[in-house]
């Protein structure tokens, strides 16, 4: 059970709410490029190798060099040195994304699930260490000056969210206790002196406090899926809105999964809309009626730039009307995921009233009809689209409109995914010319479409000739599969297919760097002619 939950969290840190810096290089593990380090960075790297050495150094170095030490400790995962640095942090604030290398970069996470898992683990390591160490420093009354911890841009594990929320409530309850104790002591001081009588004088009381008497703020990206964390977070967000709260939690992104409409209503009402920029409500089993109830609450979050409503049940006219009304209230929204909501024939109704232009649009398994693709090809969003995913829709009947759509976004589109779109040879021959004219395309996914080897070669020639292409995901050609041949011959055919693809790629690219090819099985064998 624990393993599946962990896997679920890793799978969730991607998509609309977690944008990739596609133009930056991979920044983790074997993919990370080595850069020439400055003398300051080399010295900092040496110091943080030993926590005791770090503890000695922070007593003498100028405060601005603490930043270099923290950067080195984060980069090399020196947890004990990080603890020392936070306990002696000389500044009022610490912003993680200014210190740690950005991990959500390049197109690699789009096709390499192992790499995605690695960068999420590394991100969770950063936020876990900082959160725990920060609270421990407060409880131990260390000489840190840190009052504002910003961990946005890096995922926070649900267990850490629960840990922070419980401490937020602990600080609130202790503050209330302190107020009551002070009131009691004032009353005791006003009582007449009992020394001349036989009665004993009331004793003054003291209040124990875990956190210093000041105001501290933790800003983060939260993931919540359990009832226990949901309940604790709702209470913590409620008290965080009080002006005199000692420990406040602020959310910039929220991923709320498997909670349902009623719990979402309660949670969303506690969040300050001033700060929330990304919201993911995937797998909440929202029916049409549920979404109509939830939509007015969502309209509060007018600063959202990313919204993920995938894997719910938004399909009928009323819910699509509510969705369209909601989107018209989100002027800054540029990233949207409606996957696995059957909005067939209603895409114009949903997207046409938006005041903003979408840069990211994911419509996987939405049952798109020809009219939907036709709308997309002429909509105001086409001028700004950078990432588009139309996978698991039958695009074969919409070949002409698909060609028009690709032509309209040829100068802006960076990633294009059309996996399992039932595309056949004739359609791909038609759109290959459009693919060859894509000016900024970096990643394309055409896997699980039933294409012959000759058409694969034709499309390959168009795609790998693009100057910006970095990765291309495709299935083996349908020629590789037949019920009449033994397994070893299928393997030979697949090897031949791979060889032909690389031959075409080398003929087109010459001595230039070759893009990465990802071959996968053609799963939909029932579509093979």
Question: What is each residue range found by the language model?
Answer:
Residues 164-167, 236-240, 264-272, 291-301, ...:
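A structural signal for leucine-rich repeat
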Residues 94, 149, 247-254, 277-281, ...:
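Conserved hydrophobic beta-strand positions in leucine-rich repeat
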Residues 49-50, 63, 75-78, 131, ...:
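Short, solvent-exposed loop/turn at the beta-strand->alpha-helix junction
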Residues 2-258:
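Cullin-RING E3 adaptor/co-adaptor recruitment helices
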Residues 53-58, 76, 80-84, 96, ...:
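Short, flexible/disordered secondary-structure transition segments
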Residues 45, 49, 71, 75, ...:
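Positions within ordered alpha-helical repeat solenoids
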Residues 288-290, 307, 316, 340, ...:
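Internal alpha-helical scaffold/solenoid segments in large eukaryotic proteins
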């Amino acid at each position: 059970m624990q393993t599946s939950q962990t896997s679920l969290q890793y799978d969730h840190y991607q998509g609309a709410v977690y944008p990739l810096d596609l133009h930056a290089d991979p920044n983790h593990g074997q993919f990370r490029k080595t850069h020439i380090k400055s003398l300051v960075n080399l010295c900092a790297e040496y110091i943080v190798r030993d926590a005791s050495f770090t503890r000695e150094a922070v007593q003498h170095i100028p405060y601005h060099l603490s930043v270099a030490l923290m950067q080195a400790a984060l980069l090399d995962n020196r947890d004990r040195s990080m603890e020392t640095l936070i306990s002696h942090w000389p500044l009022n604030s610490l912003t993680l994304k200014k210190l740690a290398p950005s991990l959500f970069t390049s197109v690699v996470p789009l096709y390499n699930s192992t790499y995605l898992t690695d960068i999420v683990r590394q991100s969770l390591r950063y936020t876990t260490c900082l959160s725990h160490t920060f609270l421990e420093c407060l409880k131990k009354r260390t000489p840190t000056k840190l009052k504002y911890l910003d961990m946005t841009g890096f995922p926070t594990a649900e267990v850490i969210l629960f840990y922070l929320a419980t401490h937020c409530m602990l600080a609130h309850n202790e503050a209330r206790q302190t107020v009551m104790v002070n009131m009691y002591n004032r009353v005791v001081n006003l009582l007449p002196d009992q020394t001349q009588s036989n009665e004993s004088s009331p004793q003054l009381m003291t209040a124990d406090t875990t956190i210093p008497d000041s105001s501290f703020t933790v800003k983060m990206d939260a993931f919540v899926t359990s009832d226990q964390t949901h309940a604790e977070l709702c209470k913590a967000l409620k008290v965080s809105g009080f002006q005199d709260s000692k420990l406040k939690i602020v959310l910039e992104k929220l991923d709320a999964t498997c909670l349902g409409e009623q719990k979402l209503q309660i949670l969303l009402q506690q969040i300050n809309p001033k700060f929330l920029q990304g919201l993911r409500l995937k797998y909440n089993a929202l029916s049409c009626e549920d979404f109509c109830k939830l939509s007015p609450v969502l309209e509060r979050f007018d600063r959202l730039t990313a919204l993920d409503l995938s894997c719910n049940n938004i399909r009928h006219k009323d819910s699509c009307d509510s969705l369209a009304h909601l989107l018209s209230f989100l002027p800054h929204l540029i990233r949207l995921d409606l996957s696995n909501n059957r909005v067939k024939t209603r895409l114009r109704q949903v997207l046409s009233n938006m005041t903003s232009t979408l840069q990211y649009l994911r419509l996987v398994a939405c049952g798109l009809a020809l009219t939907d693709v036709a709308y997309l090809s002429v909509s105001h969003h086409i001028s700004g689209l950078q990432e588009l995913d139309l996978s698991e829709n039958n695009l074969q009947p919409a070949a002409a409109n698909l060609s028009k759509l690709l032509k309209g976004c040829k100068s802006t589109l960076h990633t294009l995914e059309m996996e399992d779109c039932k595309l056949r040879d004739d359609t791909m021959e038609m759109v290959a010319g459009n693919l060859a004219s894509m000016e900024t395309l970096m990643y394309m996914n055409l896997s699980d479409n039933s294409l012959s080897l000759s058409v694969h070669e034709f499309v390959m020639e168009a795609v790998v000739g693009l100057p910006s292409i970095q990765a291309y995901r495709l299935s083996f050609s349908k020629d590789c599969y037949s019920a009449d041949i033994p397994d070893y011959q299928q393997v030979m055919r697949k090897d031949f297919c791979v060889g032909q693809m690389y031959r075409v790629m080398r003929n087109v690219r010459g001595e230039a760097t070759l893009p990465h090819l990802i071959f996968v099985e053609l799963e939909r064998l029932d579509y093979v002619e």
